[in-house]
């Protein structure tokens, strides 16, 4: 896809620069071998490479504005596939961005990668939160929730610091498990009612009590209610934002998450 092409091109830019710098060019493909020489990389080339990587792997992760494929894919795929897409594939793409994020900080400093991910993360949260209001399809609503939570991960990286990085990693894990449960439950609901339209789904407790109980757990987890894991990661996000980030951005994120939860 075009997104992967951008990510590959960004990776190749770093590889080509590394091959010219490190003593053994054959080791340029290994990030662990390249890291000690990060400060010798061309800053302009690294900024361009990081931009390509965010665009490329951000497309796979569903970050705004490369997120448009995600609701369609989730709504049309079988529920177990949607669970894998949201719980595993999106997080793998974000983990790739995390790897290059740390390397870019060592090469050009923290301001450029952090500011880029702050903006992309905040916009992903707000756009996804507002888009969820218009969705009647259960799986499309969950898909936009995935966009929002991937935005939270990007925002954590943008805030940076030990708390921000810890929040990003924890949110990857907790959201992966929670959203996997949510999509599996949506498949059970669709099987029981023959529809994904929220306007036509009523009385889940009477029709499928076990599914209803699991749905409540999934929704409480996605809403970041304590003691669920996403409460911990989002609490750390706000703590990191108050400690290291601009307060106006923390307010914007709080509003976006409030809209999404409601």
Question: Model segments located where?
Answer:
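Hydrophobic transmembrane alpha-helices and their helix-loop junctions in integral membrane proteins
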Residues: 1-262
């Amino acid at each position: 896809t075009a997104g992967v092409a951008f990510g590959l091109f960004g990776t190749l830019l770093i590889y080509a620069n590394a091959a010219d710098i490190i003593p053994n060019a054959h080791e340029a493909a290994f990030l662990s071998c390249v890291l000690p020489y990060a400060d010798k990389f061309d800053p302009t080339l690294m900024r361009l490479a990081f931009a390509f990587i965010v665009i490329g792997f951000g497309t796979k992760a569903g970050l705004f504005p490369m997120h448009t494929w995600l609701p369609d894919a989730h709504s049309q795929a079988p529920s177990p596939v949607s669970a894998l897409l949201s719980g595993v594939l999106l997080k793998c793409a974000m983990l790739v961005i995390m790897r290059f994020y740390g390397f870019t900080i060592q090469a050009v400093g923290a301001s450029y990668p952090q500011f880029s991910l702050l903006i992309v993360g905040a916009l992903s949260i707000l756009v996804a939160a507002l888009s969820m209001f218009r969705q009647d399809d259960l799986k499309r609503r969950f898909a936009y929730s995935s966009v929002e939570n991937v935005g939270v991960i990007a925002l954590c990286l943008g805030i940076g610091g030990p708390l921000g990085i810890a929040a990003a990693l924890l949110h990857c894990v907790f959201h992966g498990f929670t959203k996997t449960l949510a999509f599996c439950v949506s498949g059970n609901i669709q099987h029981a009612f023959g529809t994904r339209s929220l306007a036509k789904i009523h009385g889940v407790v009477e029709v499928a009590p076990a599914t209803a109980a699991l749905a409540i757990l999934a929704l409480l987890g996605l809403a970041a209610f304590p003691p669920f894991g996403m409460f911990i990661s989002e609490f750390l996000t706000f703590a990191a934002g108050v400690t290291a980030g601009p307060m106006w951005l923390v307010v914007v994120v709080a509003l976006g998450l409030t809209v999404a939860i409601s």
